[in-house]
């Protein structure tokens, strides 16, 4: 129903009906007033027009800007997933934020290595499990490092605090009893040894960011407290290599050593 239908010409009426309707209209105008009568009629017309505009707006296609934003969001989401999936990109996460072009290049190199004739196929389940456990433990220790940094710098907890020791002991017990990688859990440092390795360093007000140490040793510096958490070198344990060393040597030879450098010149300033 639109405004034109409201003002449709009425059918012809008799003189008696016309007089009766005129009397009713007069009584309505006397009760509401002429201004209110006009406002009520126009308000009804206005509501009908707004309803038709809303229906037309719903039929309007999505703007080009919205489509472009959705497309960029999908691209960025997929690139983030690639950065967490490709081993070479995962190993370089600590050296700084990777550019989109770098992630795509590493993905192409990784796929070429997978499809190359030199790359071994049909690897043993135990070998794959060992490699996956390598990345699992490396990521777990990275999370523990960040948690210890948070507890000592933000929560102001002392290393001799009972709650602090219980948290680290709980995390260590979880990584040892992991059902998937439980057979490799013995390579993780003992909770007691881990607590003994926590020590204070001299305060350094100018350094307030994490610094990556050589493989097998993680440390960070803070403006308040600077505990150092040193894990046993991963390469010292049989079947448990560092993330870069754990990659298959055929993959390394195919891509090249420079692609795996964790201290690339592009990220030296970070």
UniProtKB/Swiss-Prot annotation:
Q: For this UniProt entry, what is the primary localization, expressed as one broad class?
A: nucleus
What PROSITE patterns does its record include? BHLH, ORANGE
Its annotated compartments are: Nucleus
Any idea where the bHLH domain is?
59-114
In residue numbers, the region (Disordered) covers 1-24
Q: Which GO terms describe its cellular component?
A: nucleus
Biological process GO terms, please? regulation of DNA-templated transcription; regulation of neurogenesis
Q: Which UniProt keywords apply?
A: DNA-binding, Nucleus, Repressor, Transcription, Transcription regulation
Question: Which InterPro entries does this UniProt record tie to the protein?
Answer: bHLH_dom (IPR011598), HES_HEY (IPR050370), HLH_DNA-bd_sf (IPR036638), Orange_dom (IPR003650)
Q: Which residues form the Orange domain?
A: 136-171
In its UniProt record, a GO molecular function of this protein is: protein dimerization activity
Question: Among its keywords, does the record have NAD?
Answer: no
Q: What exactly does this protein do?
A: Transcriptional repressor which binds preferentially to the canonical E box sequence 5'-CACGCG-3'.
Instruction: Report the sequence similarity comment from the record.
Output: Belongs to the HEY family.
Q: What is this protein called?
A: Hairy and enhancer of split-related protein helt
Q: Report the gene name.
A: helt
């Amino acid at each position: 129903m639109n405004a034109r239908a409201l003002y449709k010409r009425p059918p012809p009426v008799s003189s008696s009906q016309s007089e009766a309707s005129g009397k009713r209209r007069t009584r309505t105008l006397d009760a509401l007033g002429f201004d209110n009568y006009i406002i009520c009629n126009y308000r009804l017309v206005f509501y009908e027009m707004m309803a038709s505009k809303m229906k037309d707006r719903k039929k309007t296609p999505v703007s080009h800007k919205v489509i472009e934003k959705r497309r960029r969001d999908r691209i960025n989401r997929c690139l983030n997933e690639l950065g967490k999936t490709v081993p070479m990109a995962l190993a370089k996460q600590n050296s700084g934020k990777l550019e989109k072009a770098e992630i795509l290049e590493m993905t192409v190199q990784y796929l070429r290595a997978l499809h190359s004739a030199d790359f071994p196929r049909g690897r043993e389940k135990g070998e794959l499990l060992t490699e996956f456990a390598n990345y699992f433990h490396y990521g777990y220790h990275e999370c523990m490092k960040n948690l210890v940094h948070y507890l000592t710098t933000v929560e102001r907890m002392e290393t001799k605090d009972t709650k602090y020791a219980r948290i680290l002991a709980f995390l260590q017990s979880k990584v040892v009893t992991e059902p998937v990688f439980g057979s490799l859990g013995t390579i993780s440092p003992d909770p007691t040894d881990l607590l003994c390795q926590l020590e204070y360093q001299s305060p350094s007000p100018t350094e307030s960011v994490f610094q990556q140490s050589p493989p097998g040793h993680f440390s960070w510096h803070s403006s308040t407290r600077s505990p150092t958490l040193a894990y046993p070198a991963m390469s010292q344990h049989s079947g448990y290599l560092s993330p870069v060393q754990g990659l298959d040597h055929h993959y390394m030879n195919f891509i090249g050593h420079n692609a795996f450098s964790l201290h690339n010149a592009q990220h030296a300033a970070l």
